Amino acid sequence: MKSSVLASVFAFVLFAPLSGALAGYTSLFVFGDSLSDSGNNAVALAPNVTPVPIPGNSFIATFPYMSGRYTNAQVWAQILASSLGLSANPSLLGGTDYAFGGALTGGSNPIPPSLEMQAALFLSQHGPMIPSNALYIVEGGGENAQQALVAAGGCGSNLACINGIIQSTTAGYVGDIQTIDTELEAAGAKNIVVWNVPNIGVTPAVLAEGSAASMLGTTIASVMNNALSTAIGMDSDIKLFDDFSLLNQVIADPGAFGLSNVTDACAQFTACIEDPSKFLFWDGVHPTSAAKTIISDAIESLVVPEPSTLALLTAAFLGFGFVLCSGGTRLYSGRPTGPE
């Protein structure tokens, strides 16, 4: 009887904190833009908020919505943190999410602070050595890509001009991400996830500008991502989260992800504001919280061991065998010899 209870308790302890404890993460630190901002801009820009309904697909919010974020509810970082048994509260409120809406990956403008500035602030608060068993997620580049798209639009049909903007944007973006990764690793980080750039060409705001803008937006993101993949290379401390491909997969087969509309901004429709669960986009570029859940699930599958791996680890651990004997608990190898 006691051995059965012990086995049940052991199984519960082993599998209950499946994502957090077995993955070994003690904290989640996030650096990013509006896709990741869990409330920093809401604090910094209060009491300004973006009202709904919004005018249409072209609308991109400057201020957070009533949720305090650039979406209808939680961002992916909060959803992921909850699943891992951690938290991702805004850094301005003492939390571990340093993301600010509108942030570029680098640059000298402090408002909003770039990802490089966010990482520097984090290191000044937690350095010189940071937790090696924490999870660090670097999400950025979408703002860089959008600025490049606007700038390239001013080139007209001048391909040299367009290519120059794409190349300079890409070089700056990759350099910024490499700087952040290098600084985190030098301080002790061992678990870093870097997002690539989302396919801005398929967002409602860019689609509203026509097919040429859409194709150019996709091209810009693709070039940036190819360079990022090459730069990250075989660094064992860094995992690449392919948000570009995930977005394409969702749009290609929305039903498989529980969605029905992947082209329109939900927040322009009163009915959708009340129930946004079937829409991919909340406004012209920002996903709904339903889409953020898809993102969170994908990241979790990247950073948490597969169930099969966990099962093998469990079997190996149990192979040593814990048994509760009449005189107490002892470790054994092989078959039990005492009474249950």
Annotate each language-model stretch with its function.
Residues 8-17, 319:
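Bacterial N-terminal signal peptides
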Residues 15-20, 323-327:
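C-terminal segment of classical bacterial N-terminal signal peptides
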Residues 321-340:
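C-terminal membrane-anchoring or membrane-association module
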Residues 306-326:
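A short, hydrophobic C-terminal helix/tail in secreted or cell-surface proteins
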Residues 20-308:
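Conserved active-site regions of diverse hydrolases
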